[in-house]
Amino acid sequence: MKLLVLICRLIQKKSVCIRFGNDYDAKCENIVSLQGGIIAWVKCCRYLGVFFVSGRFFKCCFDHAKCSLFSSFNSIFGKVGRFASEEVVISLLKAKCLPCFLYGLEVCPVIMRDKRSFDFYITRLFMKLFRTGSAAIVEQCQKHFDFLPIRYVIDIRTASFIERYLESTNQICMLFKQRAASNLQIIFSNYGNTVCSSNSLKTIINTSFFG
């Protein structure tokens, strides 16, 4: 019995309630357990490393991911700084910083405004690295060092994820296959009528950006 009470207390400390939909801003009473613990309603919560924000529609908050990107980059740049070449710093950025930044984005609703914001943050990092204030120079540096803009990376990762999702035989996943297929076609349609897979999408994007 004591073990059960302890487990319940641990669950309560890690649990919150969040609302999505038309009544997302309606005031709700906190949930009280049999042991007297309170599970509060919140406007933002973290689940599996992804931050959800209460709203009329399901949406995510990427502020933590942006902070993690800057924190990890500044940590690396502060140690290697001007001692390492730009190529080495960018390789470290790809290997150590981007995985944390891109974590879970392929399954999150990312709108174009978010993608532009992500590209802006990467541009700022490149400006710091190459000591320039020109976005045009940053773009040329990205092409030279084989660094694809984040908006394209997200589309490729999302398309690849949806393709794997559509192949799943999980009964719950199958309930949303039609919606997933529709989202995949929307991504493909943004890059022309010849795109039919994530591989062809990647090829077209690389050809278009890198030339």
Predicted regions located by residue number:
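Short helix-interrupting loop/turn segments at helix-coil junctions
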Residues: 3-12, 127-137
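Short, conserved micro-motifs composed of acidic
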Residues: 8-44
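Catalytic palm subdomain of template-directed nucleic-acid polymerases
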Residues: 1-5, 20-24, 54-58, 110-112
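Short coil/turn segments at secondary-structure boundaries
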Residues: 12-14, 88-91, 104-111, 136-142, ...
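Short amphipathic alpha-helical coiled-coil/interface segments
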Residues: 3, 117-126, 158-161
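Basic, alpha-helical interaction scaffolds
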Residues: 34-109
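Acidic catalytic cores of enzymes that act on phosphate-bearing nucleotides/polynucleotides
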Residues: 134, 144-211
